[in-house]
Amino acid sequence: MDIAIIGASGYAGGDLIRLLLTHKEADIVCATSRKLAGTPVTKDHIHLKNLIDLEYTNPDVENIDADFAFLAVPHTAAMQYAGKLKERGIKTVDFSADYRLPREIYEKTYGVKHSDYFKAPYGIPELHRNEVKNASFVANPGCFPTGATLAAAPVAKLAHTIIYDSKSGVSGAGDSISETTHFPNVAENILPYKITAHRHLPEMRQEAAFLGSKANVYFTPHLLPAIRGIITTAHILFNEPMELEMIQKLYQDFYKNEPFVRLQPAKLGGVRGSNFCDINFELENDGTRLVAVSAIDNLVKGAAGQAVQNMNIMCGFDEAEGIRMPGMFP
């Protein structure tokens, strides 16, 4: 199947190429970049040297000849291409936030008017597999909402409050140079940011509601002195005391058939470079608070890997094709 990657020069685009090179059904025929058009893909993705022989082109959607497309462009840019890809019948997974939320919530959260809105399934396969299976366009979730939602999903509807505390590697901020991600500011430091108003919070609230939860949902992110990975600690407060055996059964039943969720101690070293989400939890003695911890690689399960997982479901491939690999440890 011929694949086009629109916006392939960023970190997520590079990881997408890395994964697709091992996918037996995928052939990357187009990789676009406005700033690098005419140069080899390996000019900035040096780790792919000798593995791909392709030059970047300008993102001209009308002339893309592919069976499937990945939109890996920034928020507000994806809406320029999404409708055209749909019109041409090219199945697509979109990495941006442009189609993750209802129009009014998106416009309030991102401060822009949506120029080409349509509804799309929200691509956490563990929650929305059937919608993804029948879709021609899927909105790939944000990295923070992926790890957070999976941590709490089995018990979300039993909670009155869910508080997510996430810590992320700096690659989540993208490859643009900024003071926030400047080495002296990040090294040997942990930086909370957007403490009460991160733009991924509406996605977390949306998915909690989808799971039947009426809980108040809160979120605070922190920046880690690491390249990859997100550790999320979910404080889940229940309406009434719970028994540990019941909690264990809820998690085991919810994830028993999920190829990329593992119930084991959540550590960045266990998932780095992989599409796995590792989850463990402890129940407070009085049974009213569950602390669930999840670990994902923000560029894989939080971006490129989940996008490939969604593509596999949309196209009827083995769901794990191209992303069946362990984490890199040590």
Curated annotation (Swiss-Prot):
Listed under GO biological process in this entry are: L-arginine biosynthetic process
The UniProt entry, under InterPro entries, shows: AGPR_AS, AGPR_type-1, NAD(P)-bd_dom_sf, NAGSA_dehydrogenase, Semialdehyde_DH_NAD-bd
> Pathway, per UniProt?
Amino-acid biosynthesis; L-arginine biosynthesis; N(2)-acetyl-L-ornithine from L-glutamate: step 3/4
Native organism = Methanocorpusculum labreanum (strain ATCC 43576 / DSM 4855 / Z)
Cited Pfam families: Semialdhyde_dh, Semialdhyde_dhC_1
User: Can you state which reaction this protein catalyses?
Assistant: N-acetyl-L-glutamate 5-semialdehyde + phosphate + NADP(+) = N-acetyl-L-glutamyl 5-phosphate + NADPH + H(+)
Q: Where in the cell is it found?
A: Cytoplasm
Family that this chain belongs to: Belongs to the NAGSA dehydrogenase family. Type 1 subfamily.
Q: Which SUPFAM superfamilies match?
A: Glyceraldehyde-3-phosphate dehydrogenase-like, C-terminal domain, NAD(P)-binding Rossmann-fold domains
From the Swiss-Prot or TrEMBL record, give the protein name.
N-acetyl-gamma-glutamyl-phosphate reductase
